[in-house]
Structures are given as C-alpha cells and as structure tokens.
C-alpha cells in the first residue's frame, strides 16, 4: 500500500540534503530561467490558490532539467509592506520577527509540496544585504535625474498614516484595510517613469505576453498626440494651457474647466463666487482620481466668475472648476467642446452652457458627435475632415505663438514615498544649508533601525522621524543634517528581485555582469493578472534604467509572461472573511502533495478561473494509486517492480506510448497541463488492458509523470533499480513511425450479415485478408456446405463474402 506521508517526507529530505535542484552551471548546456512571482509572506500562510502557478513553473523546471537545460528556478520573499507593520502596531510585536516567522511557515508549506527550488538562492527584500542594492539603484536614478522631490497632491490616509498610490485607492478608500483617503499636497519623492513612457509602450510589441495585459499597460501609459493651446484670462495677465487631442474643434469651445486644485483658481475666482468655489473644493477632498474621472458619474462643478479668451476667435468663454479634471493629468485644465465630446456634452447640458457644432455628421440636439466629418463654423478649417483640420490648426497655433503639437501621457510619475517604518530607508540626507546629498555608496546599506514604537507620526513624516539618534547627522565640517524619514514603497524590492537570484550572495555588485548575460531575460514568468499595471510596469521601468546604465544586457526582463487563473470556492474568490479558504496543508495531509499538484493541474486550463471541488484530490489520488499498483508489487515489505513489467516488447503499447510522449511533451511546452494529464490517464487505461508492459515504456511514463507527481515517481524510479534521481534521467522521445498502427481490425460479413472481426497487418493484400477472414471459426460455420460466389475486400476495413 502506497503511504504518501512516508514517501513524500523521505524524498523532500533527500532532495534538500543532496541539493538535487541546485542551479546547473554546465557551460555546454542551454539555459532556462523559470520564475514565480514571489509571495508576500502574510500571517495566513498559503491557500490552495498559491500552488497552482507554483506547480506550473515546477513542471516546466523539472522537464527542462530532464531535457538537458541548466535551469534557474528560485524562490524568495517580498517581505516589506503595510500588513506586517499593521500587525506590529496592533500587537506591539517587531515586524521583522513577525515577517521571519511567516517566511519560515511559508517555506515549510512550499517544501511540503515538493517544489524544485534552488533554496541556496533564497532572497528576502528585508535583508540589508538585499536592500543595499535597492538603495544603490535609487541612488543611480537620483544621479540620472530620475528621482526628485516635489510638492504633489497625494492620496493621504490618516488611519494608515501614509500616502498610498493611485492604484491602491478603490472607491475613495485604501485597497488594504478600506480606510478613507484624502487629497493633500505633500513633499514626496517621485520617480520619473514618464521619461520612459514611449519605450515602455513600444517594447511591449516584442514580448510574448497575454494581449489583455499588454493592452492594460498601453491604456495605463495612455499616450495621446494632440496640441497644447494657451488661453488668456480676460482683464488679467494670467493664462493657462490646455492639452487637447482635438485641436480641430477649437472654434466649438464654449467654456473651459480647471482642476479644483489648480493654483490659478484662487487667483481668478470672483468675490461673488468665492464661497461656492471654496465649498466645492472642500467637498471633493477625499475622492480618488479614479472616482473623479468615472465617465458614468453625475457631473458636478462651479463657475469661478472668470472668463478666458479663445485664441482662435477672440470669444470670451466662462472658466469653471470640476472634479473630473485632474491637476496631475495634462495641464490640469481642459477646453470644452460639448458638441463633439460626450463628457463636455453632459456637463454643458446640466449647467445650460452653449453647444456649438463645428463638425457635421451628428444630431447635437440629442448627443455629442465625436466621429469624422466636414468642419463647419470654423473659418479657415471649413470643408476639411478631422485629420487635415487637426494638422492645419496645429500649424496656425504654432505660427501665432499660442500653441504647439504635443504628446501627452495618462501615466504620471511614480510616487515613491511612504510615511511608514517598515520599508527600505531612502538613502538621502537633507543638510541645514539646503543641500541634499546621497548617502555615500560605500556606506550602503543604510539600515533600518530596530524600533519598538513604530506608530505613524500622523504627519508627512514617517515613524523614523521620532528616532532622533538615527535622523540627526553631522558631517566632518560640523554641518548638521537630517536623514530622509520617508521609506520606499513595497514595489521597490520587487522591481528588480529577478536579477538578484542570478547572483544572490554578491557583495560587490547587484549581480555579476557575465552571469546576467548568461541568464537574462527570464524565459517564463507566471503570476496573477492583478499585477498588470503595478509590479510588471515598475519592473520594466527599473530594468530599462539598469539597461541604460549598462548593468543589465537586455531591454526587457520577462520574455514570456503567463497568468494563472483564480481557484474559487463556491464560485467566489477565497478569503478569510468569506470563510471559504481551503488550506493546502489539510489536503496534503489527507491525500498527499502529489494529489494536490496533479488535481490543480488537471482542474482545467491554467489561465481559467475554476471552482475548487472537495472531491477532486481524492479522485486524483485513486488514479495515482492505480499507477502505483500497475508498476509496483508491494505485497512484501520491500516493493519490487510489478510482474507485468518485462524487457520484451510485443508492440501492443507502441502507438499509445509514443502518442503519449509526443502529446505530453508538446502540451507541457504550451502550458496545457490538464490535457497532458488526460493523455497520461489514457496511457494508464491502455496498460490495464495488456498482460505485459515493456520496461522502457513504464520508465518513460514515470519520467513524463515525474514533473507533476514527483514524490511517487521518484519512489517508483528507485523501485525500478535506479540510484540517481529521476530528475537526472533524460526526457523521453517518441518514434514517429510508431504513431500509426501496424495492424488494423477488419470486419467480415457473409451474405450481408456481420459474422466476426480479425486483426491483420495494415495494408495486407486482398488474398491475405480473404484467407484470414475465411479461416475464422465463426465464418467457417456459416460457409459450410455453401459455395463462395464472390468476395469483395475493402482494404483495412471489411471483407464481404457472398455464398450460396
């Protein structure tokens, strides 16, 4: 009887002690770098959703090793971040201790699932020897002018005591914890990701990534070509610029809208409108950018009392403020052409503002017309279609000095400051004379001081501001300074971790350039689609910066990306609050890690979201037990190969075996693990129907199944008499000539009635087929005393006999 508890522990211990999965370094072999998105080690541990992606990468790693590749398959921990700090605040425990305990638990769970990680390369982002290089990268960005300080409107969460990124705000509340968010201006460190916008966009074309992810990044970057136009304020020396993708519609501009935060608002608001404007600004303080720009929300706004001059025709147009205009996007001001823009139309209709048609083709009494058409009411643009009119208007604006062609991006620079304790310290000193300097490179890492009181300060400063011994510094000339007290966001450490795995213990460089050249880019990266516009975009940005510095040899970090789907319970995402979390430890205990791994790969396509079936693992366990009984005789204490295993080959399994090798190999390569496992089940069914199984085929099957169910296959491999791990056995190949049957089954009819079947060599002659048919006992009985008048042979199909 196969005992998964004993066998799995035995092989996990063996693999760990023998470093079976140490990264290969043979210079003659090709490389394969297969990577999981490293997890945040939360207090909850793994749930059954985690192993799905991890099993997929593990299958690829194990197959590629067997195919003769040097494989890099590492694991580490994205260990900074808010949850550990929140826990520390609530319990008074040190976040470092809490994090390390969680890591130990996660690691134990991963090892119990038999993943073939090279644990010698384990990293964690909270290790000073790791974040030394996170800080080093920040310093290079600072020197390149890509890291800068700015007073910017931010999403401030008083409850968390920190700023959160736009991407981390959902419906005016923080993604983690659901706390309210308010907009306020604060001094922040910013990273100039916008400087790389075009490259981040253009280089997507060369990546083997899911198209929806590429599209999400394209939309997030949001490149648009248009014009910047200057509007002067009436009776004032003030002016403002607007960005528009439709400069051709400038003659139809009937009002303008400024972002409520725009500095100009205070200066131009009339005394009569001041109260209404101030009240409106206060009312939108806690709204996130996403909420404010939602196309479906009801339009709100207030007239400032000021007018602007339309540069193209000298008309006076009212200046309004509205929350759908963001200070951080474009210029923080828009020109409104309600006849030809849906949002402007809704706003104009609500506030009874003029709607002027300048492009023919729609019915503006009913809705805005945004399509192509002939320009009207547009002076020198009349009669032109959209594209010609745009070009002509840009030329006119440029010539008159009131505008120019402009490219704009929806993406903003990355807010890189967090007012928290548990993050990488930013290696900067602010001196009393106003100078800002970097901590010298030879003094890195700038370590996070150990501290028990990590309550948020409630100000734009992090809890580090309370640690005066750490904060206050004096240089050799007696000049006083203060360390930067903001820390980096959790995204920092994950923006380059895939590089550190290549050379994790190097204290002289981020990684050896020769090793980077050998291993980059990552060949296969598997993780959740939720990281499309955060981690994946940030990692590409950092990688391009390092490429420009000559640190990395490739423009892109991840050549192929694949998103696994969610594992649901009762058609809902698993979460503690819903009480529907399935713990993998329980499944492993009852059915074994091999059953869990095989079930998760067999459930359905890897990229689909699928409902967990509590009976699934037991069904898979029955299949694995059948594999064991087919190949192993364990009636005595020492298991031996089954009596069915033979060194002879009668050819009965030739076709199905070679078909299985071909299908499994191809489907693994295509990450179609469910259909590959189906094919292995088909082969096992065929094995049940024969008396003998050629040893070569039994061993070939074990090699094919080993990446999915490694513990049982390792055990069977050793029962078959091998000393080395099945991991080092060459991957099976198939014989194409055996993919076709060498024999066929033919039917026999006598006088139109079927009287039997027989096996015969494929493409046998008519004479051979007739002889075989008439030799059948059953047929002989029907032919007795009759004369055969006619025999019709349909090759490989049927023998028709007419007898009287």
Swiss-Prot record:
In the record, biological process GO terms are:
leucyl-tRNA aminoacylation
User: Where is the motif 'KMSKS' region annotated in this sequence?
Assistant: 573-577
For this UniProt record, the keywords arranged alphabetically read as follows: Aminoacyl-tRNA synthetase, ATP-binding, Cytoplasm, Ligase, Nucleotide-binding, Protein biosynthesis
Q: Record's GO cellular component, any one?
A: cytosol
Q: Where does the record say this protein resides?
A: Cytoplasm
Q: Which family does it belong to?
A: Belongs to the class-I aminoacyl-tRNA synthetase family.
Q: What is this protein called?
A: Leucine--tRNA ligase
Species annotation: Lactobacillus delbrueckii subsp. bulgaricus (strain ATCC 11842 / DSM 20081 / BCRC 10696 / JCM 1002 / NBRC 13953 / NCIMB 11778 / NCTC 12712 / WDCM 00102 / Lb 14)
